[in-house]
Amino acid sequence: LMEYSIHDAIRAGFTKVVFIVKPEILGLVRTLCGDSLRGKTTRGGKPLEVCYAFQDFESLPAFYTLPAGRTKPFGTTHAVLCARDYVNEPFCVINADDYYAVDAYRTIYEELGKLAPSGESTMVGYLLRNTVSAHGTVSRGVCHVEDGHLTGIHEALKIQLFPDGTIADVADGQRRELAADMPVSMNFWGFMPSIFDQMEEYLDDFLRALPPEEIKAECLLPNMVGDLLKKGRLSVSVLHSADRWFGMTYHQDRQAVARELARLHENGTYPPTLRS
């Protein structure tokens, strides 16, 4: 799915791709995707810039002592912060295993050109009903939107689609029904480079507050955005996509994803092969 995202981003006008990877999978990422980008050009005809940023424990602040037994990465805020040295322009953030659809990239690229250098960002929101899986629960950033801007966001960690079509968050053994047409975040964010200072500050505060023995907690991007919203330090415009998101949350999703991609090739959304 990452190849489709890169293809769509280049068509929209983006000129650089930064892969954020664990050092031990760099070779795999190069083989599966990075090497195929050699010779690719941007919409303006210039060579596509491709970079690799490592998310590892070495990039954590010096004051933090890693607890014994910690192997889990520190989450999406830390991941994006690891790309700081490679990003000096407005940028978008995506998940590698999600398909966001063509129009979303055009929309966010245009919006990034309108943002102030600091204090403003953007996101693409999707209807909840278009982002659930029939094969198990999913986690989503539930968005609260007023006048086209995000006013709050919280992570619903266990959203389930039931046979009768209802959707509910079933975390903690409770069942809290959710509106099928409510907007959710799929981690498709648009930021200005000034956000890195705020990310660094938030990650520092997150790490200082962790119990010394904590080995699983993650510093998540939606939580950082929500914190900045509460403090009045960030404004987030919400762009809407009626397109159907799809992704590889579960192995059983693979067949449906393959069918949908085949349909998109057949109807001309994509050429016969992305590597031509």
Region locations from a protein language model:
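Short, surface-exposed amphipathic charged segments that create phosphate/polyanion-binding patches used
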Residues: 61-73, 136-141, 252-256
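Conserved core of the sugar-phosphate nucleotidyltransferase
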Residues: 102-189
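Conserved alpha/beta core of the MobA/IspD/sugar-nucleotide pyrophosphorylase nucleotidyltransferase superfamily
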Residues: 146-147, 153, 160-276
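Conserved N-terminal catalytic core of the sugar/cofactor nucleotidyltransferase
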Residues: 1-93, 100-105, 114
